[in-house]
Amino acid sequence: MKALLLSLLLLLPVVALAQAPTIEISGANFRPLPVAVPAPLTQNDGAKALVAPFDSAFSFDLTASGILQVLDRKGFTADAKEGMAAASINFSRWADVGAEALVKVSLAQDGGVLRGELRLFNVGTGREDLKVSKDAPADNASLLAHRLADALYRHFTREPSPFLSRITYVRKAGTNRDVYVADWDGGNARALTKGGINILPALSQDGSQVAFTTYRKNRPDIYVQSPGGEAKAVISGGQMATGAAFSPDGKRIAYSLAEGESAQVYVANADGSGARALTDTPYGLNTSPTWSPDGKRIAFVSNRGGSPQVYIMNADGTGVRRLTFQGNYNQTPDWSPRGDLIVFTARDERNAFDLFTVSVETGKVTRLTQDQGSNEEPAFSPNGRLIVFTSTRNGGSQLYVMTADGNNQLPLRTEKGTYQTPDWSPLPQAQ
């Protein structure tokens, strides 16, 4: 993956840009920026009641971003009543705890609206480098947290964060497996299905629809549903259809269809019409399609060579080539929105499942997880910087997130339960 230089641009005037430190997001020179984030200040009683949900989401966003080292508040020595203005801040106290940047947030409730102001300071110079205000419904403090965190991330990286995106996943309860949609961190989750076996959800490009495989007719069919809408069968009719994936333009879906002793990758219009097979191996299994970000290629899993491996083909089924040659059981590929990597699950020499990336161009494989239970079912964030996945490292299968190079692995803020097959939505059009 090409290294992105994270310009911290802590000096806004042009004359000072040459002095701005940079952080290389990937590679040996990467160093997260040490940042102090004291508890939010509140301007009225209404805001005080909303500090906890805001702070939980905001702290998680910054910690999981991978670009910041959020310092432990227990070590802070500055006055907790310190204000938002630079003149009221004792920067030497923040420097003493190792902070290079200071993030201050103030909250105020105005009727049904929660308003927030964020200020970013360079601890070394005492200069204010960012001042931004956002608001959100008062009953959704985490949305305000995501909006402010996104503004901070954009300031540092000059690209959108994943904080305003959504994830979908399956939550298992007894014999039921239901599809859920939630904020990227697992908050504000709500069920899309109710009862039965519903698996392998995938979000459309605009996030307005979820395709999933369901057994409601006692066979696997592919349905599409919008949050709050009715589920509609798009691939149904007796054969076993699984694992739909929307094309980047949202006009097509790729999926696997079992026919006798084989399973082939198909592509169809998003409404299920115009279906045609892209693979044709009489006794082989071809499954788990995932689109390249430009929609011109599809990666998939096939055992045509004797064991499940990741392959790539053109979106019309031509130009098939094998991508992975290490390991004897590779599955669940997901193509990075940046186009350079595919992340997948592999069974290693100890029969443990772990996550790896493979370069689309060179075939170089990089290990991301090891010695922490089974780690499976990865999906890239919409900016390609993070990966969501399932892990059994703490018992049951839970949702985790990490940076695309395998660092900074954290559990999502989900309730207790058993989770499967997460998928990440593209970024919303309006940030």
From Swiss-Prot:
Q: Which InterPro entries match?
A: 6-blade_b-propeller_TolB-like, PD40, Tol-Pal_TolB, TolB_N
Q: Where in the cell is it found?
A: Periplasm
List the residue ranges of the region (Disordered).
410-431
Is Transmembrane helix one of the keywords UniProt gives this record? no
Tell whether Methyltransferase is among the UniProt keywords. Answer: no
Q: Which top-rank group of organisms is this from?
A: Bacteria
Q: What is its main location?
A: periplasm
From the record, what ranges are coiled-coil? Answer: none
Q: Which GO terms describe its biological process?
A: cell division; protein import
A single Gene Ontology CC term: periplasmic space
Alphabetized, the UniProt keywords read:
Cell cycle, Cell division, Periplasm, Signal
Q: Where is the signal peptide?
A: 1-18
The record's function comment reads: Part of the Tol-Pal system, which plays a role in outer membrane invagination during cell division and is important for maintaining outer membrane integrity.
Q: How does it assemble?
A: The Tol-Pal system is composed of five core proteins: the inner membrane proteins TolA, TolQ and TolR, the periplasmic protein TolB and the outer membrane protein Pal. They form a network linking the inner and outer membranes and the peptidoglycan layer.
Q: Which family does it belong to?
A: Belongs to the TolB family.
Which NCBIfam families does the record match to this protein?
propeller_TolB
Q: From the Swiss-Prot or TrEMBL record, give the protein name.
A: Tol-Pal system protein TolB
